[in-house]
Amino acid sequence: MSTKQLEVVRPTAKFPPSVWGDQFLIYEENTAEQLEVEEKVKKLIEVVRKDIKSSLEVQTEHANLLKLIDAIQRLGIAYHFEQEIEQALQHIYGAYGDNWKGGNPSLWFRILRQQGFYVSCDIFNELKDENGSFKESLTSDVQGLLDLYEATYLRVQGEAVLEDAQVFTRTHLNKLTNSLTKTNSTLSTHIQDALEEPIRKRLPRLEALRYIPFYGQQEFHNKSLLKLAKLGFILLQSLHKKELSQVSRWWKRLDITKDLPYVRDRMVESYFWALGVYFEPKYSHARMFLAKVFTVTAVIDDTYDSYGTYEELMIFTEAVQRWSVSCIDMLPEYMKPMYQVLMGVYEEMEEILLKDGKEYQLSYAIESMKELTRNYMMEAKWAHEGYVPTTEEHLSVSYVSSGYVMLTTTCFVGMGDLVTDESFKWALSKPPLVKASCIIARLMNDFVSQKEEKEKMHVVSNVDSYMKQYGVTKEYAHNVLKNKIEDAWMDLTLESLTCKNVPMHVKIRVINLTQVLTVMYKGKDNYTEVGEELIHHIRSLLIHGMSI
């Protein structure tokens, strides 16, 4: 070994080990019990399908139909009724346009905008008095107040009436939580949950877990719907546990943390992240592929951030650009297993895609991975040179290094005919919808990992760049960048409504990816340092059963 090699000083981070051990390796399937549940689910689906159809046929029932659709979506069973829901909302939009007359305009507005219908917010001006303030009488209707609050998170830039409504509803809901704590603790908790995280920003799977017991406590709940939600949860959990067992065994076989002890061992958390993007059964192959790519990306990210020298990273970046097993020999010894695993994940998925003639999809995912490492390398260059980029310069690179362009493109792989060649090209072009998601990912990550990045000799965060560029305090920079996050959420909504050349089931993947961030970066980087709340979520979704 040369003297130069002996003198290498590596800024090694010390990450906590996995909290899960081997508990997900084994999955025992009860086929007979599962078949019995599946039969019950089929019958319940038909019952609910008839409810949707009968409500659609009677105009006076359209308000109740929206309530039914809202419950179906929040209970996590909308994937059974995608066609029926789309037809129902198309009918309602066609019949009423922006002139909804069925009551509860807040629910109408939120449900239609969630589904991609760009309905006007002018209807909320009717809730104001002659002085332009929201009527005080609204505060006596707690559910109406909550519905209005939730609707405000589907606003876009320039919708002042919804901005005012958010301030109004938040103020009064905060007051109500205190008075309701003793008289109606369930409703009080429901309101507190909404104030902490509105539906728009909630992870659908966790919302189902939260909403099922709440819905069951409502006096006039639909019993068939509730039973379907519970049985559906059991079936989904069984599938997800089976998938997690498969990817856990794959990760165990690789044993990459033995060769690379400096990396994060986060297979389970990676699967949870992928589960947030899509939980439906038809996306099983796509979900497992995304989880594997996510896990390997974390290993690569840690190598750029916490271990590799500048020269080594240049070699690795070049090897990824060439994307060939022949490049292994050019790599430092410790990087070879990582590169082999990266190649292996994509080769394995290619075999699956070949069966359906969809192998072309992989080329887009590979291109996005190449781009990601190029941006990792640019950040490594900045860190190596001690360079502090401007906020604009930083974000032009770091929104890509957030990984969300790569994850967006990669999550489409394996979705079959639902995603076309045009959808992949759209994602790689970094359209406003994807860029908004990336900005949210980057800034939320920067808020919670600013201190850790400094300790790892990483490039400074966007917070640091803003502080230096404008000579402001950390608190001021945080407030400015938090506003950027809220602006990005509104951009996300606007693009989901106006981007008509991409189907909603594709755009919803980007929205779901963004919603995962509210869990993973809540208070800290929960992926790196797994917190109790995330552990609770994973246990609830993948370990604990659902009582019928």
UniProtKB/Swiss-Prot annotation:
Domain notes: The Asp-Asp-Xaa-Xaa-Asp/Glu (DDXXD/E) motif is important for the catalytic activity, presumably through binding to Mg(2+).
The keyword Heme is annotated on this UniProt entry: no
Entry keywords, A to Z: Cytoplasm, Lyase, Magnesium, Metal-binding
Protein role: Sesquiterpene synthase involved in the biosynthesis of volatile compounds. Mediates the conversion of (2E,6E)-farnesyl diphosphate (FPP) into guaia-4,6-diene.
GO biological process: diterpenoid biosynthetic process; terpene biosynthetic process
Pfam families linked to this entry: Terpene_synth, Terpene_synth_C
CDD domains in alphabetical order: Terpene_cyclase_plant_C1
Family the UniProt entry places it in: Belongs to the terpene synthase family. Tpsa subfamily.
EC number(s) on file: 4.2.3.179
SUPFAM superfamilies named among the record's database cross-references: Terpenoid cyclases/Protein prenyltransferases, Terpenoid synthases
Tissues with expression: Highly expressed in glandular trichomes. Expressed in leaves and stems.
Chain positions of motif DDXXD motif: 301-305
Name of the protein this chain belongs to: Sesquiterpene synthase TPS2
Cofactor mode of binding and number, as noted: Binds 3 Mg(2+) ions per subunit.
Reaction equations catalysed: (2E,6E)-farnesyl diphosphate = guaia-4,6-diene + diphosphate
Domain of life: Eukaryota
Biochemical pathway: Secondary metabolite biosynthesis; terpenoid biosynthesis
Binding site for Mg(2+) 3: 453
Binding site for Mg(2+) 1: 301, 305
Gene Ontology cellular component terms for the protein in this record: cytoplasm
